[in-house]
Amino acid sequence: MAEEKTIEWLKEGEFGVSLMVDQTLIPYEYKKIKIKTSDEMFNAIKTMIVRGAPAIGIAGAHGAALAAIELKGEDDFINKLYKKMDYINSSRPTAVNLSWAIKEQKEIVEKNKEKTKKEIIEALIQNAIKLENEDIEINKKIGDFGAELVPKNAGILTHCNAGALATVGYGTALGVIRSAFKKDKNIMVYADETRPRQQGARITTYELVRDGIPTTLITDGMCSYFMKKGMINFVVTGADRIAANGDTANKIGTSTIAIAAKYYGIPFYIAAPKSTIDMKIKTGDDIVIELRDEDEVKIINGKPICADGVKVINPSFDVTDHSLIKGIITEYGVFKPEELKENFS
């Protein structure tokens, strides 16, 4: 599945719709659904039908085009369009790729604002398609740079899902793993389940098994056990937002893994495109962390797993301190956290 698009613009009718994999159904069903309105896109992002920072960015670009299509008969077209874009941008606050894509689409509108509404719509669609295609190429570059870091016979731990389904295709952290596998590095991947939404168990194992990459599923609390035994000697995860100093927001539990890796002397890498680096954010303290519904923790398969009345706090992300990160793998190469300002300002 590394080579197919998991989210793409589909030409249908006058302008088209967004076509994406419904990730809430995996691993039980691989199904693509059509998103036809900006409200549907907001809901798809919010409810994690589409998830993964790069994929959310493309979804935002598609949502902007859908909003323009909806408003083509309205007066005050551009102001109303910007309001809808801002609404889509509010669906998930932590992943910077969403706001990056909305900003890209607003720039397209500004460049074409003297043209007809139809021309603006077409420009937004074409830019969204361009971003789709660029994402796959970016991920393959990340994969190739990262694969050079992976030792032979490596036991690689990854957290959550930063694969084809978290992007348009190929993946960031899983892109590194895919490229290492192609280079016959004889790897074993350890995917932790990633509570509470189980993206590692549901989605990462689904991707890797489909691609024939040796994979072992472990629970979130097991990483130190396998590190101490020498079975894990390399860690790579994706990212949702990287601050200027290298502090990195990623799925809750990432920081715990990084601390354990540091203790055992295991290199911990982040794999992410330039669009995930937010130079306006100085440190991780300034990153907004999304809090999600407590039922994600309390209920599994429709059944409660805890006592009634217990309190739950459910942050979706944590911030890994830059001092724990060996390097950040981008489409431009691998950088130490302290090198970001010089190379991406």
Predicted regions and their residues:
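Short, glycine-rich nucleotide/cofactor-binding loops
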Residues: 32-38, 163-167, 244-249
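Small-aliphatic-rich amphipathic alpha-helix that forms the alpha element of a beta-alpha
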Residues: 43-50, 56, 256-259
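N-terminal active-site beta-alpha-beta segment that forms phosphate/nucleotide-binding
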Residues: 49-218
